[in-house]
A protein has these predicted regions:
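Acidic, low-complexity, intrinsically disordered interaction modules
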Residues: 6, 12-64
């Protein structure tokens, strides 16, 4: 596992960071480039869709 690899915990931590930045409001991942890139990278590495990776970031439940 490299420094820039995205795992479940790191993806959830990045989503939480965006959630705090929005004062616990609605998080649009496209407005946060670090979160958007992490979701795309996670989806590519794990063979799931962008939406499934976003659900994992939000809830912690794997849908794939």
């Amino acid at each position: 596992m490299g420094l820039f690899d995205i795992n479940d915990e790191k993806l959830q931590a990045l989503y939480h960071r965006a959630l705090v930045e929005t004062n616990y409001g609605f998080v649009n991942p496209r407005k946060y480039p670090y979160l958007d890139r992490a979701i795309m990278q996670y989806a590519r590495e794990n063979g799931c869709s962008y939406d499934q990776a976003l659900i994992l970031a939000k809830t912690g439940n794997k849908m794939f």
